[in-house]
Amino acid sequence: MVLYIILAIIVIILIAVGVLFYLRSNKRQIIEKAIERKNEIETLPFDQNLAQLSKLNLKGETKTKYDAMKKDNVESTNKYLAPVEEKIHNAEALLDKFSFNASQSEIDDANELMDSYEQSYQQQLEDVNEIIALYKDNDELYDKCKVDYREMKRDVLANRHQFGEAASLLETEIEKFEPRLEQYEVLKADGNYVQAHNHIAALNEQMKQLRSYMEEIPELIRETQKELPGQFQDLKYGCRDLKVEGYDLDHVKVDSTLQSLKTELSFVEPLISRLELEEANDKLANINDKLDDMYDLIEHEVKAKNDVEETKDIITDNLFKAKDMNYTLQTEIEYVRENYYINESDAQSVRQFENEIQSLISVYDDILKEMSKSAVRYSEVQDNLQYLEDHVTVINDKQEKLQNHLIQLREDEAEAEDNLLRVQSKKEEVYRRLLASNLTSVPERFIIMKNEIDHEVRDVNEQFSERPIHVKQLKDKVSKIVIQMNTFEDEANDVLVNAVYAEKLIQYGNRYRKDYSNVDKSLNEAERLFKNNRYKRAIEIAEQALESVEPGVTKHIEEEVIKQ
């Protein structure tokens, strides 16, 4: 037994030792990777990067940047790369002692140092590339500026007439570029690449602005010397022609406004000659806006004349229509009010319409007189005609509505009389059916309903004979009588159908009287109820009796009665 225990302990120890050596082998691989990485980063070409700068002009800012980067290289090597060897050595020693965690910590520190060293190299590489790119950009901008300088100088010399009085100032501004180009050469020779870049970039922007001025100035001069004076002339003679055609354009103030615009235009060329183009554009925009306002006023007058010519005849027709309809309404009201009740407000409205129409006709006559003058402001005439058109349209709509109301009075009276005749005819027909039916007697409630309808009909007939008739009240009463008549007819039909159905049930049930005493008893009760005009209750008892001996028969009998 003891032997087995000893063997087990030995096995466990051997397994533990094997695991430790396995773990140490894995950690050893991590250390070897760190060593490989160290060997790789030691070959990073710091000096080669700096060598690219040495090809440039190592003076001024370039020399300062070169020295700073060289110093950073030394510091990076001492601070990040030098301690790596010691960290790796410590990790190996700790690993031999099976201190896995401590060994891993040393390797992690070594990797962090190498990360920092690589970042330092990457930063140096970016800085070097940036400096080289800036040198290249500076030279490209410089070459472009030299070309622009020559072209601008040649353009002013060759096309001096296009720039007017601004040509001299343009030449002066262009000549200022030459010493600034030379200044760039000095900055570049001194190695001040950042100052050189800022200088040449600013010079390029100024050249682009002056180039845009050179493109804009001929357009401004052409607008100032030709286009606007031509528009002034066209506007002046165009307005003169319109006045001959009868237009009143005094409110446009053509002569005074044009004189003011000419004065304002005279200040534009001096602004152009001083290269104050923003102010020149503002003045030209203001002149064009005022011209547009004048054109809008004139165009409005021309359109107003066309509109006046189109609407004048329409308004004339509408005024005559309103006057004729008003006369017709006055005549109709005098006739209609003898036979029908009419609100006094309707009669007053007609008289008010007459006054308004006469007032509108007077205004229209004044407008026609105004249009017969040698000079007419058609925009005002258009507004006045629109006022007339709106008002006469409202009057015509109201008069037409009133006329339809008068016509409706006669139609409503005829409709009420027709409905009353139909009620009388239908009432007699229904009552005859009640008398001719199988009812033992006409139920008292139908006699009462008939008498009520007769009374209402006599009352309405008396109102028909009175004058003037209040048509609305009369129509409402006839509508109520029609409702009474419909109720009378519906209930009568219901009673007649129930009576026939009850009679059919009793007749059919007679065949079961001898064999079924309970059926005989129920049918006797149904007959008693039938004689007392209680048809619904008689139906209930008869149906119950028949269903007890012949289920479903009552439905068949009911369908036959409905078909009849």
Curated annotation (Swiss-Prot):
Subcellular location: Cell membrane
Biological process per Gene Ontology, one example term: septin ring assembly
Parts forming coiled coils: 99-138, 190-223, 271-300, 350-435, 471-550
InterPro entries: EzrA
UniProt membrane topology term: Single-pass membrane protein
Entry annotated with the keyword Cell cycle: yes
One Pfam family linked to the record: EzrA
Membrane-side (Cytoplasmic) residue stretches: 24-564
Keyword Coiled coil: yes
Transmembrane segments: 5-23
GO cellular component, one term: septin ring
HAMAP family (alphabetical): EzrA
Membership in a protein family: Belongs to the EzrA family.
Function of the protein: Negative regulator of FtsZ ring formation; modulates the frequency and position of FtsZ ring formation. Inhibits FtsZ ring formation at polar sites. Interacts either with FtsZ or with one of its binding partners to promote depolymerization.
Protein name from the UniProt record: Septation ring formation regulator EzrA
